[in-house]
Amino acid sequence: MPAVKRKAAPTLGAKLQRRVRPRFEAEPDSDVEGSSDEAPSEEEGGGFHTGSDTEEEEEDEEIEEGSEPGSDDDSDAPSEHGGAGIDASQLSFGALARAQASLGALKKKKKKKGGDEDGSDDDEEKEEPNWKTEIEKGMKAKVEKHHRTNKHAPVETTSKKPVSRRRDFLANEPAKPKSRDPRFAPPGIGGSSGKSVVDEIKARKAYSFLDDYQEDEMKQLRMAIKKTKDANEKEELQRALLSMESKKKARARKDKERELLSEHKKKEKELIKQGKTPFYLKKSEQKKQLLVEQFASMKKSQVDKAIERKRKKIAGKEKKALPLARRTAEDR
């Protein structure tokens, strides 16, 4: 038979060093009876207590002793309602710790509620006067700042412009056409191109007497230029006279063009009656015939001056069209 080893019996010193849990008799009227009974039952289910459990109980006892005096008053509160006082020395350390933790949590909740109420009142008082500034800040933040990528680049602006909600085209009546003086209005307003030419010819014939008035004004200007001694005033009068003379020449040139076209149309109408095909003058042909008639009515010296003036004008245009001359060794 194999030898069976037995455990050695614990010595007296080991027995004395072992920590023993204090026992107490729970009162039936106490409210904490359930919690005190549950604590040993749970601990007894474990079989035995380790050293860590005893250390935790000692820490709870130290916390209880170092707690504020208000906690003792709170712990005695149930005794006042229950009628019978509870001896704290008879309660377990775990039950006292749980009771103390529950009371501390209640105090914290009350403090938080009071702080939140005070804070909300202060926030409302602070926010009331500053709501305008907050709105203005929000509006400024929405405004987009347009920047240029380069100082020479154009500013980039958004195309997302809001359309106005007002629609005035239904409320406002259309403007009625105003009466115009044909002397100052352009010919053929609201008509076709052919109609405008006819209206211009009619207006020119109807208001041909204005040419006589303009001739008188030009004579008065020439007299005023001779009499005035102020250089600035004399220059202004000369400009006015020059503009009137240029307008007179332009009107005379247009009148000649119309006469030339009207004569050509009359001849073509007679030829069409004879059964011939019509021939329409080009603008280049019209200019040639106008130049021939213009030189025919001028003297030889005037013709030479006009030809020289025209030659210089054409030479100047050709010179501008030429590229710039390059520098050569002789120019250096």
Swiss-Prot record:
Biased composition (Basic and acidic residues): 128-142, 165-183, 315-332
Name this polypeptide is given: rRNA biogenesis protein rrp-36
Residue ranges, compositional bias (Acidic residues): 27-45, 53-77, 117-127
Localization (cell): Nucleus, Nucleolus
Gene source species: Neurospora crassa (strain ATCC 24698 / 74-OR23-1A / CBS 708.71 / DSM 1257 / FGSC 987)
Function: Component of the 90S pre-ribosome involved in the maturation of rRNAs. Required for early cleavages of the pre-RNAs in the 40S ribosomal subunit maturation pathway.
Keyword rRNA processing: yes
Coiled coil: 212-274
GO CC terms in record: 90S preribosome; nucleolus
Family classification: Belongs to the RRP36 family.
The protein's assembly and partners: Associates with 90S and pre-40S pre-ribosomal particles.
Region span, Disordered: 1-91, 104-196, 243-262, 312-332
Gene: rrp-36
Cited InterPro entries: RRP36 (IPR009292)
Keyword NAD: no
Domain of life: Eukaryota
Keywords: Coiled coil, Nucleus, Ribonucleoprotein, Ribosome biogenesis, rRNA processing
GO process terms (BP): maturation of SSU-rRNA from tricistronic rRNA transcript (SSU-rRNA, 5.8S rRNA, LSU-rRNA)
